[in-house]
Amino acid sequence: MRLMRYLFTTVLTLLFISCSKGCSYNESQSSHVEQTTASNQVEDKISPDDYELSTDGLTLIKWKNPNTKVLDMNRDTYLSKIRFIGDWAFWDCNGLTSINIPNSVTSIGEWAFMQCSSLTSINIPNSVTRIKHYAFSNCSSLTSIDIPNSVTSIEQGAFSDCNSLTNTYIPSSVTSIGKEAFASCSHLTDINIPSSVTSIESQAFMQCLRLKSINIPSSVTSIGKEVFAFCSSLTSINIPNSVRSIGRAAFYDCGSLTNVTMPSSVTSIDKFAFARCINLASVVFRGNNPPKIPSLDSYVFNETPSNLKLIIPKGAKNRYIKAGYPEDKIIEQ
């Protein structure tokens, strides 16, 4: 999956390079003196040659100085007034370690900070309402991120492959977590999903290898395909009564998962949902009516322990057998 994403972004990169760039914003030169931050980092001087703006001065098209390490955009006359950070604007700025975004900015573009491998700190102001696709993907030194409460959705791949990210704050303004939003954040240990979230899209937390537990709020109605696949440290999961469907391979290869409780609200479980959960000991079904499952060739519990127990309510055994659940694993309780 990650290889496909990298191939995809590589193709887009080549297309981007081949396209003609927008016009520079030619105004009188701006300048500022070196400043020392609270963390004793020296902010780099800003020259008009360091960046390219759109003709109206509202969009940062490209940051052009590869040697910049600490950047406070508020200290430049024109950067402090921009509204948009454009697609690819800081792409592959490997030396950039810290950036302060002005509170005039409302949108951070697609791939804007992708592969800024030295970026450890970023201030996202409350003016920002959109963090677009793959905006911070592959920022491998970023350890934490505070998403402002002005943001309503975390879009596709926004923080994917941020390998050093250990925690993140998701505000109650967020209603949806997009596809691959935190995929392959291999050091992410826990995350709090607020009750405002109604949608968690496919692969959102796929390959978060150190994620141990997650609480899904009762506002969520479905768990998309491969959302928690390959989360090998995940030991517990709370599925609320609001959830109606569990997508394909949603918990595939979650090798540390031992017990799952399935609320009566769940009406369908797609193929391979819990396949290769090699330590899964029991699944407790609360409903008298079994969730619909696919045929045995794509069985929900493929490659799970032979002594897996499917615990169901008393009197419901025949219904579960007719629905395709294996009789030898069913225990009425």
PLM feature segments, named:
Residues 16-49:
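Bacterial Sec-dependent N-terminal signal peptides
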Residues 48-57, 66-84, 94-107, 117-130, ...:
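Structural signature of tandem-repeat unit edges
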Residues 60-62:
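Short linear proline/tyrosine/threonine-rich motifs used for host-factor recruitment
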Residues 297-301, 316-329:
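Short, aromatic/basic amphipathic alpha-helical patches
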